[in-house]
């Protein structure tokens, strides 16, 4: 992650929304450069760390929050749950998301794990912590990203436009108080990981329910179709 001004790293709407934590973003860039200087790598690659904030702030209608990036080298791409198009096999959580997607919407299983089309259509795929040390899950929790992503979540919720937050798992459900401002609905279920998917994630219909909540608030539904 390069030492550049926030408005050079993210979309203009996000630059304004994240202005209260601009110094924290700078500090996190310094932290990551110090990690590299000490011989410790991080994921995703530098240009993708803030990728979730490169899509228009004003167009976000769905928020899906992950915990931290995939720690497997080659998997994390800066969007929660998404992987690069060539990744095989898919992470188990993403495979379960796709199974529910197919069951809920009746679409065929996607050909790859790239969720970029969702991000382009107004789905914010945000990890609570934006980086991780390879093969070391949760290694960057408590380092400072939480303040940045809390600011992002609160800024989204405070807009005067409808949004639905899809909260998978207990960690995500703790974010609900941040969504109290504005016209924001939420859908909660167990996490899609293999440890909990069978306890209520499967059958939860998050995609169709989110669209029902959006249209009920006068907003356009999301086109969830993936190639």
UniProtKB/Swiss-Prot annotation:
Catalytic reaction list: Hydrolyzes single-stranded DNA or mismatched double-stranded DNA and polynucleotides, releasing free uracil
Gene3D superfamilies noted in UniProt: Uracil-DNA glycosylase-like domain
Gene name as annotated: ung
InterPro entries, per the entry: UDG_fam1 (IPR002043), Ura-DNA_Glyclase_AS (IPR018085), Uracil-DNA_glycosylase-like (IPR005122), Uracil-DNA_glycosylase-like_sf (IPR036895)
GO molecular function terms attached to this record: uracil DNA N-glycosylase activity
Protein family according to the UniProt entry: Belongs to the uracil-DNA glycosylase (UDG) superfamily. UNG family.
A Pfam family hit: UDG
GO cellular component, one term: cytoplasm
Record localization: Cytoplasm
Active site: 68 (proton acceptor)
Protein name as annotated: Uracil-DNA glycosylase
HAMAP family on file: UDG
Root EC class: hydrolase
NCBIfam families per the UniProt record, alphabetical: PRK05254.1-1 (NF003588), PRK05254.1-5 (NF003592), ung (TIGR00628)
Functional note: Excises uracil residues from the DNA which can arise as a result of misincorporation of dUMP residues by DNA polymerase or due to deamination of cytosine.
Organism: Mycobacterium marinum (strain ATCC BAA-535 / M)
EC number: 3.2.2.27
Main location group: cytoplasm
Database matches in PANTHER family: URACIL-DNA GLYCOSYLASE
């Amino acid at each position: 992650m390069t030492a550049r001004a926030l408005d050079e790293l993210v979309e203009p709407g996000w630059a304004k929304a994240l202005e209260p934590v601009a110094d924290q973003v700078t500090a996190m860039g310094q932290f990551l450069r110090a990690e590299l200087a000490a011989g410790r790598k991080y994921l995703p690659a530098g240009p993708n760390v803030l990728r979730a904030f490169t899509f228009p702030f004003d167009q976000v209608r769905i928020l899906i929050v992950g915990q931290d990036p995939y720690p497997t080298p080659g998997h994390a791409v800066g969007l929660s749950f998404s992987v690069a198009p060539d990744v095989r096999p898919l992470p188990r959580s993403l495979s379960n998301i796709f199974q529910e997607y197919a069951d809920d919407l009746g679409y065929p299983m996607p050909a790859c794990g790239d969720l970029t089309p969702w991000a382009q259509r107004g789905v914010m795929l945000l990890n609570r912590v934006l980086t991780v040390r390879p093969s070391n899950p949760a290694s960057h929790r408590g380092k400072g990203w939480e303040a940045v992503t809390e600011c992002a979540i609160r800024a989204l919720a405070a807009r005067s436009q409808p949004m639905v937050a899809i909260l998978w798992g207990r960690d995500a459900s703790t974010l609900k108080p941040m969504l109290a401002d504005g016209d924001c609905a939420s859908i909660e279920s167990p996490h899609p990981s293999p440890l909990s998917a069978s306890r209520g994630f499967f059958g939860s219909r998050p995609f169709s329910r989110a669209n029902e909540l959006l249209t009920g608030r006068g907003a356009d539904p999301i086109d969830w179709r993936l190639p």
